[in-house]
Design a protein with these regions (language model features):
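N-terminal flexible/basic segments that precede or flank functional cores
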Residues: 1-30, 34-35, 100-121
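Residues within the alpha-helical elements of helix-turn-helix
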Residues: 34, 45, 74
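Residue-level signal for the short linker/turn that defines the boundary of a DNA-recognition helix
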Residues: 36-37, 66
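Short alpha-helical DNA-recognition segment
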Residues: 37-55
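Residue-level detection of the helix-turn-helix DNA-binding "recognition helix"
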Residues: 58-60, 87
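Short, basic-rich loop-to-helix N-cap that marks the start of a DNA-contacting helix
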Residues: 60-73
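Short amphipathic recognition helices of helix-turn-helix/homeodomain-type DNA-binding modules
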Residues: 81-101
């Protein structure tokens, strides 16, 4: 895999090039530590099993829409915040694994995209 291809694609997607973005698990752990709460406390408060939250913290499970909504309610954020953290993590790892394949795809841009590029993000 060409590192210049990978770097170019990571930059194009607004992702760090020399390190992975903050993982969903690291983010959850940082919020918990800031509040002085345990994973078990948070899991009980949001109505999920402690093992489910622990798997998120260990990056063995991604943040689903349901989990994002629960974390948002608990931490006073938005569900989109948590989904964005998960997406950045997933996209970074996929680009590192398959950059040449993605780079080889020939772009075709629909008129709707060209005309509304400023509203699509």
């Amino acid at each position: 895999m060409g590192t210049t291809t990978t770097t170019r694609l990571l930059k194009a997607h607004g992702l760090p090039t020399h390190r992975p973005p903050t993982s969903p698990g690291e983010m959850v752990l940082a919020f918990l530590e800031d509040l002085g709460r345990s994973q078990a406390d948070a899991a009980r408060a949001v109505g999920i099993k402690a093992t489910r939250l622990n798997e998120v913290v260990k990056n063995k499970r991604g943040i689903s829409a349901d989990t994002a909504l629960r974390l948002a309610a608990y931490f006073g954020t938005t569900a989109q915040f948590w989904l964005n953290v998960q997406t950045a993590w997933d996209v970074w790892h996929e680009l590192r694994r398959r950059a040449p394949a993605y780079s080889a795809i020939r772009q075709r841009q629909a008129r709707a995209v060209r005309e509304n590029a400023h509203t699509i993000a």
